[in-house]
Regions:
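Phosphate/nucleotide-binding beta-alpha loop and adjacent structural elements of enzyme active sites
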Residues: 1-195
């Protein structure tokens, strides 16, 4: 009913429900991206995902529908509070409070609110967000690892779905990942325009 209310045209409602089905609830923040991901993997009973910049375990999650189907994977976020919530709700998953990048070192993370989807390690994005929310972030030292190192440590040899949502740190994240080695079936990356 909520979807029908938001889609004014019956044509778009019919198109939407024919593509995604009538009774799926979207947990993603914006456009039901998680419904597309779920539809893409409709033939997969089980699988694995890596969610870099996972934020909350349900709300705005692109992997929660997969988790509900029995999938498991690795959730990574710079917000300790977000990872603590993931540990409670997503018990099958590995939940890591780290940053991902091309170099392994201790870096500054910029935390505006505990579960803010705008927390970042990117200095330009920090300034953009600071102006948007009119608040200075808390600067928290955090370990940054290469995604390859994390996957090796947890013996993840196959990734069905890779999601990257890291507020300006996308290229740095990808530079620590061997795409050809892991060859995910589907990759989604939230990219912000110049901030």
């Amino acid at each position: 009913k909520k979807v029908r209310k938001n889609l004014k045209s019956s044509y778009f409602y019919n198109l939407f429900t024919n593509f995604f089905g009538k009774y799926k609830k979207s947990y993603s923040e914006n456009f039901g991206e998680d419904l597309f991901v779920d539809f893409f993997f409709k033939e997969f009973k089980k699988g694995s995902y890596v969610d870099v910049g996972c934020n909350l375990p349900k709300t705005s999650s692109l992997t929660y529908l997969l988790y509900k189907k029995g999938w498991s994977g690795i959730n990574i976020d710079i917000s300790k509070r977000a990872i603590d919530l993931n540990k409670v709700i997503r018990k099958r998953d590995i939940n890591l409070n780290i940053s991902i990048g091309k170099e392994e070192k201790i870096i500054d993370s910029f935390i505006f609110y505990d579960n803010c989807s705008m927390n970042t390690v990117d200095k330009k994005f920090k300034e953009y967000t600071r102006k948007s929310v009119n608040k200075d972030p808390e600067v928290v030292k955090i370990e940054q690892l290469k995604l390859d190192s994390v996957l090796r440590k947890y013996n993840m040899n196959k990734i069905n779905y890779l999601n990257i949502d890291v507020e300006g740190n996308e290229l740095n994240t990808l530079n620590g990942f061997s795409l050809n080695k892991y060859n995910p079936d589907l990759v989604s990356i939230e990219i912000h325009d110049k901030t």
